């Protein structure tokens, strides 16, 4: 997912 312009890979929950 992309959150605030930061890409999280292998995430379960991203904030």
From Swiss-Prot:
Record bears the keyword Protease: yes
Q: How does activity depend on pH?
A: Optimum pH is 8.0.
A Gene Ontology biological process annotation? proteolysis
The UniProt activity regulation field reads: Inhibited by PMSF and p-chloromercuribenzoate. Unaffected by EDTA.
Q: Where in the cell is it found?
A: Secreted
GO CC entries: extracellular region
Q: What is its EC number?
A: 3.4.21.-
Source superkingdom? Bacteria
Task: List, in alphabetical order, the Gene Ontology terms for molecular function in this entry.
Answer: serine-type peptidase activity
- Known function: Diaminopimelinoyl-alanine endopeptidase. Has antibacterial activity.
Q: What is the annotated quaternary arrangement, including any partners?
A: Monomer.
Name of protein: Endopeptidase L4
The scientific name of the source species is: Lysobacter sp. (strain XL1)
- Upper classification of the organism: Bacteria, Pseudomonadati, Pseudomonadota, Gammaproteobacteria, Lysobacterales
């Amino acid at each position: 997912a992309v959150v605030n312009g930061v890409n999280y890979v292998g995430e379960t929950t991203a904030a």
